[in-house]
Amino acid sequence: MAHKKAGGSTRNGRDSESKRLGVKRFGGESVLAGNIIVRQRGTKFHAGVNVGIGRDHTLFALTDGKVKFEVKGPQNRKFISIED
């Protein structure tokens, strides 16, 4: 007779890789055209002046300049712009 119960398989033990989301360039920082400013899921931050938006909602600089974060509109949305 076995003295130990047979070990069953567990259904846990998996974890996905982190996606490295978040702000990459902060307010006042100088950026070059093409620099990624924010990696995000959905539009937590919206594209302002001189900022483009990628297929995965990544915000990037369209021109050289300084990053500016601002809150505006009736919904208090966060916009990111590039100032010269």
From Swiss-Prot:
Protein name listed in UniProt: Large ribosomal subunit protein bL27
Provenance organism: Shewanella pealeana (strain ATCC 700345 / ANG-SQ1)
Gene3D superfamilies: 2.40.50.100
UniProt KW Transport keyword: no
Cellular component aspect of the GO annotation: cytosolic large ribosomal subunit
Top-level taxonomic group: Bacteria
Gene Ontology MF terms in the entry: structural constituent of ribosome
Bilayer-spanning residue ranges: none
GO BP terms in the entry: translation
PROSITE patterns reported in the protein's UniProt record: RIBOSOMAL_L27 (PS00831)
UniProt entry keywords in alphabetical sequence: Ribonucleoprotein, Ribosomal protein
Chain segments carrying region Disordered: 1-22
Family: Belongs to the bacterial ribosomal protein bL27 family.
Keyword Ribosomal protein attached: yes
